[in-house]
From Swiss-Prot:
One of its GO terms (cellular component) is post-mRNA release spliceosomal complex. Residues 259-278, 298-324 are annotated as: Disordered. GO terms for molecular function: RNA lariat debranching enzyme activator activity. Belongs to the CWF19 family. This is CWF19-like protein 1. GO terms for biological process: mRNA splicing, via spliceosome. InterPro entries: Cwf19-like, Cwf19-like_C_dom-1, Cwf19-like_C_dom-2, HIT-like_sf. Transmembrane segments: none annotated. It comes from the Eukaryota. It comes from Pongo abelii (Sumatran orangutan). The lineage of its organism: Eukaryota, Metazoa, Chordata, Craniata, Vertebrata.
Length: 538
């Protein structure tokens, strides 16, 4: 049975004209049926007053489709994007983040890069650097199984995209655009590449990603630049298309060449093209292995196994976790880690007080190396995670508390197992379970109970986004995230009147304390936890 295609819409610079955009989308859906996603490139916010945006932000108005947007391209609009890792801006409107890979439940793979090119250091909050592009390429391109991605979203055009192609109109692609984006497109081989900022519509003829007669056939790339919303010249700013994720396609069907396919615009013509020489100097590859945003993990698993087996003289030695090429707030060796919050360090994991915790003893179990989710952990790391969980249960039980453990593998870079103690006097375990199920139903979240002794790896494949909660009885609840998911869901349930009764603490950013107070809490926890510290037994 053929895979049903996804129906997507892509939009150029919105520039704050939200009503015009969403009214147009509604009209299209009324006429042609519903679409699965709306992807926005270019400037989502403009220099117009915020009154129109406030209606969406407060929920007075709602986007009629799940919408994903890129970040700021100038200093003026940085204020709208509070979290560099991505966040929900309004209902049905999500900021993807500075850079990363979004893999939907369908398997569709979208790579995104926010901002404009900058070669300055430090890089402004609205720009990307050669290192950003290098890390994106490193995520995927270093595996032999890599064939390309479904969609690439950037705001700037790629430089030289007009080479060998149809006319790009008034835009001179030899002078306009970003060479870094060209390099990224060369490496990632997207089936579709969308960009904006130039206030015009340009659909380039598809170009090939292989050298004829020298390389095996590969899929073609279609580059589409979109105009700004509501432009007086009526230039096209919305693009509708259907796509089957490449991982689900028959290989022969995927590499079929369109009749109007051209040479790759990022390679020189003639004899130099036949030798595979590129116009662009390659972006320097990071020495680090991989850095995963959102959901992409499959490449890492395959690559790490092969790489370690070749490089290690001792096969039984635990394999090293992938290292992020950029800053990570939770890799213990990273200078970004707030080390005053660390309360215990094991061989493969460590404990840290949660910043803006639900209680003074709300802690996180984190891998020392860079892993994004539990399903990615190696056996030795899983073993120590379980040891920490069991030890914390005993510790909190001695203090008249039961603990709830949850993980949200969505919009996160580094695995964080949240461990929240709940006083036995507050409620029973069944009350906690009922609270999760009730709030999930209210928010139309399908929370399923899974077997007590089941392994999360049996139900969540690498690359899948999910939410998972484990109760002190061993009962487990699981939700496979398909589209959007409330980032604070776990905290909201536990902060509710039915459990901890601290609803004002549902968002960690609203309950931060001073560094001095954090240091005091950390000292107290270390002292109290010391009798249970299994790391002292080694």
């Amino acid at each position: 049975m053929a895979q049903k295609p996804l129906r997507l819409l892509t939009c150029g610079d919105v520039e704050g004209k939200f009503d015009i955009l969403f009214n147009r989308v509604q009209a299209i859906q009324k006429k042609s049926g519903n679409f699965d996603l709306l992807l926005c490139v270019g400037n989502f916010f403009g220099s117009t007053p915020d009154a129109e945006w406030e209606e969406y932000k407060t929920g007075t108005k709602k986007a009629p489709i799940q919408t994903y947007v890129l970040g700021a391209n100038n200093q003026e609009t940085v204020k709208y994007f509070q979290d560099a890792d991505g966040c929900e801006l309004a209902e049905n409107i999500t900021y993807l983040g500075r850079k990363g890979i979004f893999t939907g439940s369908s398997g569709l793979q979208i790579v995104y890069l926010s901002g404009t090119e900058s070669l300055n250091e430090p890089v402004p909050g609205y720009s990307f650097s050669p290192k950003d592009v290098s890390s994106l390429r490193t995520m995927l391109c270093t595996t032999s199984q890599f064939k390309g991605v479904d969609i690439l979203l950037t705001s700037p055009w790629p430089k030289y995209v007009g080479n060998f192609g149809n006319s790009s109109g008034e835009v001179d692609t030899k002078k306009c655009g970003s060479a870094l984006v060209s390099s990224l497109a060369t490496g990632l081989k997207p089936r579709y590449h969308f960009a904006a900022l130039e206030k015009t519509y340009y659909e380039r003829l598809p170009y090939r990603n292989h050298i004829v007669l020298q390389e095996n056939a590969q899929h073609a790339t279609r580059f589409i630049a979109l105009a700004n919303v509501g432009n007086p010249e009526k230039k096209k700013y919305l693009y509708a298309f259907s796509i089957v994720p490449m991982k689900l396609m028959d290989a022969a069907e995927l590499v079929k060449q369109p009749p109007d396919v051209t040479e790759n615009p990022y390679r020189k013509s003639g004899q130099e093209a036949s030798t595979g020489k590129q116009i662009l100097a390659p972006v320097e590859e990071s020495a680090c292995q991989f850095f995963f945003d959102l959901n992409e993990k499959q490449g890492r698993k395959r690559s790490s196994t092969g790489r370690d087996s070749k490089s290690s003289p001792h096969p039984k030695q635990p394999r090293k976790p992938p290292q992020p090429p950029g800053p990570c707030w939770f890799c213990l060796a990273s200078p970004e880690v707030e080390k005053h919050l660390v309360v215990n360090i094991g061989t493969h994991c460590y404990l840290a007080l949660a910043k803006g915790g639900l209680s003074d003893d709300h802690v996180l179990i984190l891998p020392i190396g860079h892993y994004q989710s539990v399903v990615e952990l190696s056996a030795e790391v899983v073993e120590e995670v379980e040891k920490y969980k069991a030890t914390l249960r005993r510790f909190f039980k001695s203090r008249g508390k039961r603990c709830v453990v949850f993980e949200r593998n969505y919009k996160s870079h580094h695995l964080q197992l949240q461990v929240i103690p709940v006083p036995v006097s507050c409620c029973a375990t069944d009350d906690i379970k009922d609270a999760f199920i009730t709030q999930a139903q209210e928010q139309q979240i399908e929370l399923l109970e899974i077997p007590e002794h089941s392994d999360i790896k049996q139900i969540a494949q690498p690359g899948a986004a999910y939410f998972y909660v484990e109760l002190d009885t061993g009962e487990k609840l699981f939700h496979r995230i398909k589209k959007n998911f409330p980032l604070q869901f776990g905290r909201e349930v536990l902060a509710s009147e039915a459990i901890l009764n601290v609803p004002d603490k549902s968002d960690w950013r609203q309950c931060q304390i001073s560094k001095e107070d954090e240091e005091t809490l950390a000292r107290c926890f270390r002292k109290d936890f010391e009798p249970y510290d299994f790391t002292l037994d080694d």
